[in-house]
Regions:
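Small-residue-enriched alpha-helical segments and adjacent helix-cap loops
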Residues: 1-123, 152-153
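Short beta-strand elements
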Residues: 107-111, 177-186
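A hydrophobic, small-residue-rich beta->alpha segment in the mid-to-C-terminal subdomain
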Residues: 175, 184-203
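Cysteine-rich micro-motifs
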Residues: 154, 158
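Iron-sulfur cluster-binding cysteine motifs and their immediate structural context
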Residues: 127-146, 159-176
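Short, catalytically relevant binding-site loops at active-site mouths
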Residues: 96-98, 147, 186
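Hydrophobic residues embedded in beta-strands of well-ordered beta-sheets
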Residues: 11, 115, 145-148, 177
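Short, conserved aromatic-histidine micro-motifs
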Residues: 121-131, 189
Length: 203
């Protein structure tokens, strides 16, 4: 057969002759074991045809905007849901930039942080205010040379953290997430996923 890499980084082997199926399954078994994929019966190949890979952006391991380790969280989800024949798609993104397009999936997880402000480190330069205004939702303002965050407007993106030159803004130790549901692409009814939970924790 021929190996095909799907858009969700899944491997498909096309054109296998039926008489070669047992041999191919035997060759695949070490790979399935190494990936720790749930399997009811060894030697029978991958146990589901409809499973969609969980997708994730690069997360905070590399990206300065990422609010959490997306790959680690994605692996936890994979262990809980694989294998299955449900044609639903899950995506995780580290911040509100949504590079993975989580809102276009059935189930999207968007990383959030609750910015922590230390007025003793603040020099009132206004870099965070400008950054939030230009790149996010304009949730910051200055009062008496101190920054005030509008908690209702803040989307937890962390732009203020990346813009602050003195580390007066830092990310919260606790990780938060925005969960979106029922996003989809397609010809007839494409739609963005709607918020289901905001400021949720991993549990």
């Amino acid at each position: 057969g021929q190996i095909h890499l799907t858009t969700r980084q899944g491997f498909e082997i096309e054109g296998i002759h039926m008489e070669d199926m047992d041999k191919v399954n035997e060759m695949l078994q070490p790979i399935i074991d190494n990936l720790q994929i749930n399997q009811n019966e060894a030697g029978t190949g991958y146990p589901a045809s409809g499973t969609r890979n969980v997708c994730a952006c690069i997360g905070n391991r590399v990206c300065p905007f990422g609010n959490y380790n997306t790959a680690a969280f994605a692996k936890k989800i994979e262990k809980a849901i694989f294998p299955n024949d449900l044609h639903f798609k899950i995506a995780l993104t580290g911040c509100a930039n949504d590079c993975i397009k989580a809102r276009m999936h059935d189930f999207g997880i968007i990383g959030m942080t609750e910015p922590q402000y230390d007025p003793n480190r603040c020099v009132s330069c206004g870099a965070c205010i400008k950054g939030c205004d230009k790149l996010s939702v304009d949730a910051l303002k200055m009062e008496n040379y101190r920054i005030v965050r509008n908690e209702e407007k803040c989307v937890g993106c962390g732009v203020c953290v990346t813009k602050c030159p003195t580390r007066a803004w830092t990310r919260s130790t606790k990780k938060y997430y925005r969960l979106t549901l029922m996003g989809r692409t397609g010809k007839k009814n494409p739609r963005l996923g709607e918020d289901f939970l905001i400021w949720a924790d991993e549990d």
